[in-house]
């Protein structure tokens, strides 16, 4: 394709709001154009890359007998009400009404729709298992869209859904999909690591995320340098190692702590280590107010709280609710009180004598508060985030942290949706049973961004050959010179027989062409310049920067060798 005929609006400036490197490069290289916050148009180069990513996904889905369909983006509210997610999903669900007042959602996911399709058609265990997938746009009303394609309000996803008669069948498909995802990310050129994860709003009891390692990643991965252990920090278990209490129990004493709001401020004010401070927090869980205690240098993990109580109905109590309950504001709360509130504490609170806790009076704290003497804990558990350097649950050593971009996730849904929506089949005994489900997603547009995030240098993008918008970038330095134009046209005609070629026939300066070529980042560049009359061109590999002068008689062989080694 001739570059003079392709819409590639490259730019030299970077918008101030473009924080992520991938966002900057996709804008500068002319791949995307922002319509409004979190919404982008995919320009010709991006469209070609997305097609290549989708082609790889389709090949891998077909290899495990997944069948492609296309479902509506516009979903009626009644389906979401059946599953219980219409009220539970939250403000991220984009809702609208038609002219008759009927409510709809722009789908962020398609569990309800696909379940409604199969419940009318799958009647017997003989029709199972079945896996359906689609590639289409999704919608999510993000509070703060950021990082370009990494967190947008409209995005492209591949989502798949599997239906089974038993858990063994689900396990098999789950593993097939897990392996297919691993192959997909390797093929598109992403260093992605599968990690144990939380299922979030989709639900289910078993899930893995595929995380593309990146400094800009919004998720923290906990991993081992000595084993295959990897987990999202929300799911990483904290191993409890009891420590003996060596200090003598002292008398409970109330002290004034004016204008102290945080655990660190309190530690500084009292000249105590922050890990001897105990933070008290009030949550509302299924309508019940519950106090949680954790040490001052730890952070409460609400995902673990939800898992412990087996409910998603978990929220922080409001300031008004806390004041009505305990008579003090957050920052002055503590377990020493006579209120009928259950108290749960992180395991590592057990190790402390003479705790510093809030006195349930603004500007006051207790020192030397002790478990059992001054307050009771209903139950201990793992309620916090792991710290880097702590022992991993698989015994392989210390926890290491890395940042990652979630590019895919696989879920075992079980019967959550089939039971709610009455999707049943007849087993081999003629008994009606709910379909057992799995769901599996890949962020296609997010994968595009993650590829750029991991494959670049100071000059621009470096496309992996599997997804590159074009294989070769053919450039004539000065098309006004007949020998260059003629050789360029000749090579363009010949190379198109084997490769996708972007032919820069523009009448711009050589520097502009070279800068654009580096920015766009096609794997191999062929430059027709001053030696055109001798049949010699320069061939440059974008990834390594290595270049070599090659006679056109040897060009096909040379390019084939280079391409096979990319």
From Swiss-Prot:
State the oligomer form and interacting partners.
Answer: Homodimer.
Q: Which gene encodes it?
A: proS
User: Which top EC class is given?
Assistant: ligase
| Coiled-coil segments on the chain, per record | none
Question: PROSITE patterns attached here?
Answer: AA_TRNA_LIGASE_II
Keyword Hydrolase: yes or no? no
**Name recorded for this polypeptide:** Proline--tRNA ligase
Similarity comment text for this entry = Belongs to the class-II aminoacyl-tRNA synthetase family. ProS type 1 subfamily.
Q: Kindly give the NCBIfam families that the UniProt entry links to this protein.
A: PRK09194.1, proS_fam_II
The record, for HAMAP family, names: Pro_tRNA_synth_type1
List the InterPro entries hit by this protein, alphabetically: aa-tRNA-synt_IIb, aa-tRNA-synth_II, aa-tRNA-synth_II/BPL/LPL, Anticodon-bd, Anticodon-bd_dom_sf, Pro-tRNA-ligase_IIa, Pro-tRNA-synth_IIa_bac-type, Pro-tRNA-Synthase_IIa_type1
Q: Which GO terms describe its molecular function?
A: aminoacyl-tRNA deacylase activity; ATP binding; catalytic activity, acting on a protein; proline-tRNA ligase activity; transferase activity
Q: Which reaction does it catalyse?
A: tRNA(Pro) + L-proline + ATP = L-prolyl-tRNA(Pro) + AMP + diphosphate
